Amino acid sequence: MGQLDGLVAVVTGGARGIGAGIASVMAEQGARVAILDLDGETAASTAAGLATPGLGMACDVILEEPLQAAVRQVVDQFGGLDIFVNNAGAGRMPLDPTITRPTGGGGRVEDMAPDSWDEQLAQNLRSTFLGTKVAVPYLKARGGGSIVNIASIAGLGASPTLPAYAAAKAGVISLSKSSALEYAPANIRVNAICPGFLWTRAWEGLATGMKMSVPQFADREPRDIFLEVVKNGVPLRREQTPEDIGHLAAFLSSPVGWNITGQAISVDGGITLR
C-alpha cells in the first residue's frame, strides 16, 4: 500500500521537470494524478506513463475559467480532489553572469520591462493564487486535503539576478502561510517547497550563457558547468532532482504529514545554510 492510496491529485505544470517528478512519485504512492500543462500533448504522454491511471490535458493556469473547467473535469472523472500541487511557473536566468544585460525576467531591476515583471508574477504567483482558489471548494467537499506550492530558495532571500522571480516566489511562500491559517478550520493543509539546484531548462540556459561569456567554461558542456556550480555551491555536493521534490510533496500530502501546515521547506542540499 502507498501513502496516497485512494487519493486524487492535480499537478500543474506537470508535463516535465519538477512537476513530472511530483506526479510520478504521487502515482507510485497510489494517487490518481491529473497533469495540467500548457503542453497538453506532453502532459498526456507523461500521465500515460504513471504507475496509476492518470489524466493529462492542456490548461493555462493563469486563466481562471480554463482552470476551473479543467479541475471540474478531473473531479468528474476521478470522483473528487484531495491534493493540489501548484507547480506551474517559470524563471528566466540572465544569460550574462555579470548581470549587465537586460534579459526579460532576469537581470537588473533598472533594465527590466514592466511587462516582464508582470509576466513573472503571473506565471509564478497568480497561478498559485488561482490554483488555491479553484482547489479549496473541492477539498472542503472531501473534508480536507493538501495544497503544496512549489516556491524556490530564491524566495527566501536576496536574488539580485532574478528580482521578479524571487519576489514572486516570496509571494508564494507568504500566500502559503496565509492560506494555511485561513483554511486550517476546514482541515486543509498548505505548505511550500523551496527547491535548490535542479537541472532545468532555466539552468541549461544559464550554463549556456556562462559557457559563452566565462573563459574558464569555454570548452565545457552546459551540463558539466552546472555540476561544477553544484559541487562548489551545495554543501552536500549533489544536485537536487524532481523526485526529491516529489517525495516531500507526497509526504506532506499523506496522512503522515497531517500536522504539518504553513511551512516553507527547503530541498537544497544545504545551500540556504550558508
Residue ranges and their predicted role:
Residues S152:
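Residue(s) in the substrate-gating loop at a strand-loop-helix junction
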Residues Q3-V33, S179:
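Canonical Rossmann dinucleotide-binding motif of NAD(H)/NADP(H)-dependent dehydrogenases/reductases
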Residues A184, R189, I260-G262:
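Short, small/polar-rich loop/turn modules that mediate ligand/substrate recognition or access, typified
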Residues T132, A168, S176:
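Active-site helix of classical SDR
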Residues P137, L181-E182, W258:
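Alpha-helical segment proximal to the catalytic Tyr-Lys
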Residues L95-V109, A113-L121, V230:
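Substrate-binding pocket helix/loop in short-chain dehydrogenase/reductase
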Residues G157, L236, A249-A250, V256, ...:
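Short C-terminal tail/terminal secondary-structure segment
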